[in-house]
């Protein structure tokens, strides 16, 4: 099985007068003919083992649109959005640029 592209972005922030640090990271990967998955992690004082706070799975629909579903905590409305491949690429590019600026 051949894996597709893997892009990982990370950013962290902290206040000067505290040891608390918040770290955000996203992993984006694609397997041709299958699905695109974006996992986002948010941690306070990151530990070596962590689980995603949210996962977005984007499934190729009719070749023109992607269907996006967020896994959210129970009780939260699960909203569904539609992204074109161009919008999805733009969103990933913006996130990568923001992470590189930090």
UniProtKB/Swiss-Prot annotation:
Coiled-coil annotation: which residues?
none
Q: Which cysteines are disulphide-bonded?
A: none
This protein's UniProt keywords: Host-virus interaction, Inhibition of host innate immune response by virus, Suppressor of RNA silencing, Viral immunoevasion
Out of the domains of life, which is the source?
Viruses
Which biological process, per GO, is one annotated for this protein?
Answer: symbiont-mediated suppression of host innate immune response
The record ties this protein, via InterPro entries, to: Gemini_C4
Q: Which family does it belong to?
A: Belongs to the geminiviridae protein AC4/C4 family.
Q: What does this protein do?
A: Pathogenicity determinant. May act as a suppressor of RNA-mediated gene silencing, also known as post-transcriptional gene silencing (PTGS), a mechanism of plant viral defense that limits the accumulation of viral RNAs.
Identification of the protein by name: Protein AC4
Q: Which organism is it from?
A: Indian cassava mosaic virus
């Amino acid at each position: 099985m051949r894996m597709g592209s893997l892009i990982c972005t990370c950013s962290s922030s902290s206040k000067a007068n505290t040891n608390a640090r918040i770290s955000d990271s996203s992993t984006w990967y694609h397997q041709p003919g299958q699905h695109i998955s974006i996992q986002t992690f948010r941690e306070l004082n990151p530990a070596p083992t962590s689980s995603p706070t949210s996962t977005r799975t984007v499934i190729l629909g009719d070749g023109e649109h992607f269907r996006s579903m967020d896994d959210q905590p129970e009780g939260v409305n699960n909203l569904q959005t539609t992204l074109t491949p161009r919008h999805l690429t733009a969103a990933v590019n913006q996130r990568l640029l923001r992470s590189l600026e930090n």
